[in-house]
Amino acid sequence: MSVRGGGAPLLDAVLAGRACCAEETVDAEPAGLFPEEEALVARAVPGRRREFATARLCARRALAALGAAPAPLLRGRRGAPAWPAGVIGSITHCAGFRGAAVAPADRVLALGIDAEPHAPLPRGVLGAVAFGPERARLRVLAARRSDICWDRLLFSAKESVYKAWSGYGGAWLGFEDAEASWLLDGTAEGPRARVPGQGEEHRLGGRGRPPVPRAPARAGGGAGAHGGRSGVAAGRFRVRILVPPPPVRPDGFAFPQVLHGRWLVRDGLLLTAVTVPRTALPRPIPTAPKEPF
């Protein structure tokens, strides 16, 4: 289920019905916040207060679709929203877009969403978010579809993965700790793909990671409001975690080493989402061997 201020729901397209989501392109007034939430942004500039209020409004609408009663949504570990018990969720915002997605914790282990302007990353940032094989794949993909900002897509995919990882309880994850590949129009670019010149990816923060400037938020939909390239494209991506996963939970569920997600480019925006269904059980809890008689 999804709701939106107007037009087709973008988040629902990348979540594929696995979560309740809500999104807005016009900012709300902070008057809709609970007092506890207002205190979190009491010293923020007006634009940040409106951005915060709209994202919280989206979260409440998505939670209402799950049957949750309205309540303050405060900050938890690492500044991410502290979702109600029994709920997994994620929030995202960029210029001209605010969104939230939630799912029952008994059906989804982890969830991450990210929205970005569909525009190239600032100069010098790609080297901090992608390593050699990924950059080689980006060059191949750019030759095939130059209308897609593949560098921004890589950044966004890893952002979604980090939100899912962090929400699950994982330790710090750097950009260099995850490797991304993509699927578009039936053509995959993955770790085994042949690349010319080769023998045969609150957010992710790699060590020494430079900040990625974001365009000033302003209301209104459409490509002009986001300052990015227009057009429509969609596909899937895969991200392989290169560090040990969080410990297996007592109920036997474990965070997978490989995550699969969806991406969408539309109206000057780029969106990505990752969900880890609770059916994912890559490894059971080891049991102690029985003592011999």
Predicted features, each with a name:
Residues 1-293:
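Core catalytic alpha/beta fold that binds nucleotide/phospho-ligands
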